[in-house]
Amino acid sequence: MNPTATFYMANGKKIVVELLPESAPNTVASFIWCAGHGWLDNHAIQRIVPGSWVDLSYEAFHHKECAYLIPNEFTLHPEITPLESHPGCVCMGGYGEMGLAGCEPFFPLRDCPEHKGVYPVFGKVIEGMDEIYRLEKVDTKPVPFPYPGVVVNEPLQPEIIEKVVLDLKGREYLEPVRMPGDKKPATWNFD
């Protein structure tokens, strides 16, 4: 059995994700490492692009401990065939050549063939797609973003993830493989 992550929302709803370690082992390990430390708890969802995705964070969940990059999953594991990105998946965001975010998951709201092999699918939603579609429709406002051409809209009323609860099915997961060096995206400003 695969591990699961349950996102408990402040409105009483929940989103349950089956994690897919066979499809994206390092990405799953990274998500588990961050969620297991509680760094995703009490977080306001930061970016909603209707018709495209619900992006939980682009600032490493406001935790320095989450502000690390991991290698492209399919460079690290070339034997794995990337999964298709579509509604019902959860993917890990990233920063191009710099690498993948250690923990900046997003839920696609459309088929995203351009993500295959770039932003790994590391889980599938097994409960709570109605909540993801509700989030797509909340009122948002545009916010400045340091990367030209990237649309960032945050909810007018905060949509809070109260906590993320992991069920690892009795397995242990090691810390993720991280990118060497100290390059960081412009969005990770903790000063």
Residue ranges and their predicted role:
Residues M1-D191:
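Cyclophilin-like peptidyl-prolyl cis-trans isomerases
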